[in-house]
Amino acid sequence: MASTDQLIQEKPKLLAGVVKASLKALRFIRNERDATIATAMKFAGLDKRLATRMYDDLIGTFTQNGTVDEETQRNDIEVIRQILKMPETIPTQKAYDFRFAREADRQLTQSGWRP
């Protein structure tokens, strides 16, 4: 998920809500395999075999809590740098801000939210 510094500064409550909703969706996807496959079949028009394969192939790439480790951050920045033909890399702390994800994860965990 990406945002601008302007949106973070001007509408932090909106951004917090979007991040929290996204984490709820991720928790649902991770915990409700059959329902997620059925949803993919319905909304993407996939047959069960393909939807199941897609789920099984991708589930390991989904973040647990809305954050990614520093190595993943550096790799992502490097790919973007190459695509945009940027001469310099961007420091991870300038490109990533996980405070909204960490807070949403804390709130959901503390409240005992389950899909």
Locate each region found by the language model.
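Short glycine- and hydrophobic/aromatic-rich loop-to-beta-strand nucleating segment
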Residues: 1-2, 7-8
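Generic, ordered loop/turn and secondary-structure boundary motif
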Residues: 8-9, 63, 96-101
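Secondary-structure end/capping motifs
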Residues: 10-88
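Conserved C-terminal helix/tail region of periplasmic/extracytoplasmic solute-binding proteins
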Residues: 81-115
